[in-house]
Amino acid sequence: MDLEQLQDLADKKLKINDTELDLESLKTPQIHNEFLKHLTKFKLLLSKSQIEYYTQRKQKWEYYTGKASPEVYTLKPFSFKLLKTDVDKYLDADPELAKYKQKVDYIQTVVDFLDRTLKQISNRGFQIKNAIDWRKFTSGAI
């Protein structure tokens, strides 16, 4: 599932049917559990992606600083002698490394979205209670 699908799912699941507030209240734990499963899955993916990124970054650092094995340079020669201060610029501009960074950033965005969605789900009970209280007030029961 990607971010857009999760956003569509959240739009659908978090909509409160104000004619059946009692049933909506009972749905909250199932909705919370569903999004918690997604959050757990994406946190594990984030951890795996970060490890891949850091591993790739180390290999690229070795390549740009001249510390990689000679076989690496026969396949992909790099004849420049970089200053230590310039290595980070080359790492930031490396297209292969950028793909790993982009993946980490995307998954982090999904995790952040799921965190905020779970907070909304946790507040759903208060929203339903407020709607019930408002109905009581407008009908003169309170």
How would you label these PLM feature ranges?
Residues 1-142:
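Charge-rich amphipathic alpha-helical interaction elements
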